[in-house]
Amino acid sequence: MKEEVSELVPSLRKFAFSLTGNIHDADDLLQNTIEKLLTKPLPQDATLMAWAFRVCRNLWIDEYRAQKVRASAAVNPELQAQDEAHLDEALSGGITLKQVSKAMGELPPEQRETLSLIAIQGMSYSDASEVLEVPAGTIMSRLARARSKLSNMLNPQQEVVL
């Protein structure tokens, strides 16, 4: 089991980073995921890959909920807006990886998860639907919405042609 889990580590690390947007949080999430994978038995009706991504996602959701409560008291919106304004001034020109990461962070969690599994991890719709426990049609609609929102966030002045 350890060998199979270790083969999934690079993909799980990318997925964890796409969820958290921070390498340190991603590594913490990855560590917690691996710990759970190695201590809990694989469900009989699941593949290791789908189960591993599901465990990672569920741990992230748990932490996301807890962090949301903690962050609401700690964040100073005025300072954060000031920092973002200075960063925007410093970055002129094309779209940066940081902008894409920030935009992905603003997507609803279910769209961010779907986009990450399909576009970053290269999963098929059926594999992603197994990981997220939703029908393939839901994966397709979430992916379309995520791509549309991401495009609008990164290119706000782009005209929509009907």
Q: Positions of the model-derived regions?
A:
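Internal acidic/polar
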Residues: 70-97, 124
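C-terminal edge and immediately downstream basic/flexible tail or linker adjoining helix-turn-helix-like DNA-binding
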Residues: 1, 72, 126, 130-133, ...
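Helix-turn-helix DNA-binding module
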Residues: 105, 109-113, 121-138, 149-152
